Amino acid sequence: MAKKSKIARNDRRRETVERYAARRAELKEVIRRPGTPEPERNRAVEELRRQPRDASATRVRNRDSVDGRPRGYLRRFGLSRVRMREQAHAGFLPGVTTSSW
């Protein structure tokens, strides 16, 4: 089980990313576009720099939805490998079967 403070911090980061996502995309497009005048590009870079660090999507960590474990995350299930194995053996994941060959 991950610390509750780590899980809460990650949740706050997700909210911050969601809040700033549209404006960040606009600014990045202005910066990326080759025809943008230099002063406008500089203003966009400066505004992007003034945004909070946690507004960047790379700051969000994928965590197990059950206990918040940060490692071994499987996107398809939203679980860590440990929790996925437990739930698969218990039959809680429809369509998941143990392999045999």
From Swiss-Prot:
Which Gene3D superfamilies does the annotation name?
A: 1.10.287.1480
> Which Gene Ontology terms cover its molecular function?
rRNA binding; structural constituent of ribosome
Any Pfam family the entry gives:
Ribosomal_S14
Q: Which SUPFAM superfamilies did the record assign?
A: Glucocorticoid receptor-like (DNA-binding domain)
- GO CC, alphabetical: small ribosomal subunit
**Positions with biased composition (Basic and acidic residues):** 38-53, 61-70
Q: One of this protein's GO BP terms?
A: translation
What are the protein's UniProt keywords? Ribonucleoprotein, Ribosomal protein, RNA-binding, rRNA-binding
Residue ranges for the region (Disordered) are 32-71
Oligomeric state and interaction partners are given as: Part of the 30S ribosomal subunit. Contacts proteins S3 and S10.
* Family statement drawn from the similarity comment of this UniProt entry: Belongs to the universal ribosomal protein uS14 family.
- Role description: Binds 16S rRNA, required for the assembly of 30S particles and may also be responsible for determining the conformation of the 16S rRNA at the A site.
* Identification of the protein by name: Small ribosomal subunit protein uS14A
Species for this entry: Streptomyces griseus subsp. griseus (strain JCM 4626 / CBS 651.72 / NBRC 13350 / KCC S-0626 / ISP 5235)
